[in-house]
Amino acid sequence: MRVFANPVGDGSIWFDNLATADGTPVAYDPQARTFLPMPPFCANREVIGCNWIAPEQGAFCRACAMTELAPDPSIPNAIPNWTQTEAAKRWVLDNLGRWHWFRPEDPGARPVFHMLAEGPTPVPMGHVGGVVTISVAEADPVLSITRREALEEPYRTMIGHMRHEIAHMLWWRLSLREDFLEAFRAMFGDERADYPTALQRHYHDGPPPGWRMSFLTSYASAHPHEDWAETAAHLLHLTDITDSFVAAGLSSPEQPSAGWDPYVETDAERLIHVAASLVAGVNHVNRSMGLSDLYPFVLSDFSRRKLVFVHDWLRRGAQGR
């Protein structure tokens, strides 16, 4: 993510800022990718702290307009959790906008979000036909850690959930193209394999032996749909980590040039090589403070080829249907 210029003075603005350091209200314009010191502000600004501009005063911004169902406010912590969930959604949508997904120039369908709070029964997250269902309860760090440990996952965050579920929607968009499915099946396998049976087998038997040689996560080994979603989410992780590193003014010997833009990079292998070197370095720094790795995953040769495949399609796919 970029670091933005203060529109009314010196200093920087961060992506989630509602105001400058001196208290001037600001809002983010996702089309121009800049902050403005004036309305119209999103109608959700006072409700969930949305800091995007709206087409007119009293209207929802581009991101909030995609939320069709909001959580039941009578459920404890629903609104604070929704606030964090929508912030993660805005972050991921802006990342994807760098490749023109879901912007006005994108002729295809937008995701529709169902943001649901949890009562006694957990809410299953997923995607069906352009509708992305998200459990806002996962924004609660205690619940997220509890579930991460129960599922033996090395990483579980709301941004991760957003990237994964939106990746399913991106696959659905790309599958409408005549040239996608054959190439996808050659790389990931046939997605027509029975999905419920595959997940049941995964949760009963676990991943196949040696899965790390072919998959980024054990869950990716369950079914081609999940392999795509995990791989696409990881491409977004790695690209945004690299972009944030550059935006922070840091540099690396692997970085092609000063001011290099990972989202403009056409050579996916170079992007992945740079990202891999950065996460290895940051993982090492985190360990110096006894912290968990920023990116606790291994990039096998086959996983890198899948990342290259996803990069190629996500960079050019938004101009299709």
Predicted region positions:
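Active-site recognition of the HExxH zinc-binding catalytic motif
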Residues: 156-177, 229
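Auxiliary, metal-adjacent structural segments of Zn-dependent hydrolase domains
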Residues: 80-141
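Pan-zinc metallopeptidase signature
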Residues: 4, 11, 220-321
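N-terminal cysteine/histidine-rich coordination modules
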Residues: 1-64
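Short pre-active-site segment immediately N-terminal to the catalytic Zn-binding motif
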Residues: 142-162
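Post-HExxH zinc-binding segment in Zn-dependent metallohydrolases
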Residues: 172-242
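A short mid-domain helix/strand-loop element embedded in enzyme catalytic domains
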Residues: 110, 123-149, 177, 198-211
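Fold-level signature of zinc-dependent metallopeptidase catalytic domains
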Residues: 56-85
